[in-house]
Amino acid sequence: MAIALALKVFAGLLAAALAALLLEHYGLTGPSSSLPQPRNPQRPHPAPGPGDSNIFWGLQISDIHVSRFRDPSRAVDLEKFCSETIDIIQPALVLATGDLTDAKTKEQLGSRQQEVEWQTYQSILKKTRVMEKTKWLDIKGNHDAYNIPSLESVKNYYRKYSAVHRDGSFHYVHNTPFGNYSFISVDATQNPGPKRPFNFFGILDEKQMKELLLLAKESKESNHTIWFGHFTTSTILSPSPGIRSIMSSATAYLCGHLHTLGGLMPILHTRHFQGTLELEVGDWKDNRRYRIFAFDHDLFSFEDLIFGNWPVILITNPKSLLYSCDKHEPLERILHSTHIRVLAFSLSSITSVTIKIDGVNLGQAIHLSGPIFILKWNPRNYSNGTHNIEAIVQDSAGRSTSVHHIFSVQENIHLTFNPLASFILLTDHCMVVQKFARKLPRIQENPLLTRLLAYERRIQLRKSQMEEMPRQVMRVGCEFPCFPQTHATFPTPPCIHQPGKLSELLQLGFLWRFYYVGMIV
């Protein structure tokens, strides 16, 4: 029976993945004129050349998890990042995409907002004066919303200690002499904020979706729009037409949340059917990951990095074929460009930037200004098929790093993303977990799974964790058809009054864990 159940679970996951991909491809509601459409990129000029204009860069950091009880080096390294790394790279802006604090109890089983963690986070920002050096845009993650009964609660420390100081999604415009670039945040944290593990998924209701649609329309005249949030789109519950449709005019959606799935998926990148890139960045908490991104003549490039590794290199022209999209970018500019362009940063001065294409040494790039290095080239020499470009950078202290990627100046050539990464980022995991929950009585007929569920319940009840859940309102549903339209007030969680019956939320909390472990094995 257990084997049959396992096969059914696997078949259900496979069917859900195929259904999600088909729905992603064909959509549920068809084209909608009310949704912002991808802009027609200007082409083919200005093309990347010998000038130092038409370029800016930024950073993303996510899942910092400043902790009162664990790994003080997270905060120590964050302070170094805000001083040393920021001073060297000098980004135009930094996107801190959620889980700024850990918000766990000492034994790590429960959750609680720890004000000292927020004070530590804010003190780092103030001590390093990072908000004077760059635009620091920090947003909430699920950990930052644990145990918060309402946004007006004194426990909502995000309002008091963050750089942004306000809840909800927002639109930031980076103005340059060569155009405007929009950055739209997606706040899908739950309100009220339940305890762990019930806070894994994000939720957007109808009102929030309308607000995001307005922000998308505001950005339609910008050169590019980047959306950023904590949750992957696959872990956000949203009403029709869905969050991916709302952000379809964006070049990319930058997020965190999944922590490289415990190191099993260090690269979680994919592309929505509408062309928007979804780029999850690894966590700062355990892996000290961060990301550099740039717009060079409206061509978007990025590189995922490990803190403390120098030199940092980003090839901005020619850009990577895998992350190219003619719906959002003027890719013809690569063919009309006159120079290969590289950003290079290090603790010591850069002494050499060597460029190779298909293993052939093209020579040393020359320093233009700041971190920009250029090398004259003729892209028409590479007009057929795909090619590999490599940049090797060395500094005066002897540090050396190389990066490479596949590029093409030919149209209608595409590369595909890792299928497992696409499955993780494009499948509607909320729907899958909900279907598991609906079939839970059948699952409980299995003695092994019944014991596992009971064990999970004992863990959640340990040290009266459930009694600490916000008591004013516990939302067990949402305002759109993915869940029943149910809002209930519980003076004490129902599973405490009814020990023999698992609450729906407890079922979901267990099942998403079971589901994710089963998915990646």
Predicted segments with their positions:
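Residue-level marker for buried hydrophobic side chains located in beta-strands
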Residues: 58-60, 94-96, 138, 227, ...
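Active-site glycine-centered loops adjacent to acidic/histidine catalytic or metal-binding residues
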Residues: 63, 98-99, 141-142, 230, ...
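Post-signal peptide N-terminal segment of secreted/secretory-pathway proteins
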Residues: 97, 105-106
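Acidic-and-aromatic substrate-binding clefts and catalytic sites of carbohydrate-active enzymes
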Residues: 67-75, 111-112, 233-237
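Short acidic, glycine-rich surface-loop motifs adjacent to enzyme active sites
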Residues: 97, 216-235
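Extended active-site neighborhood of metal-dependent phosphoesterases/phosphodiesterases
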Residues: 25-50, 106-223, 238-252, 258-305
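A short, flexible beta-alpha/helix-coil linker loop
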Residues: 64-67, 100-103, 189-193, 234
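Acidic, histidine-bearing metal-coordination/catalytic regions of metal-dependent phosphoesterases
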Residues: 1-93, 126-128, 132-135, 310-521
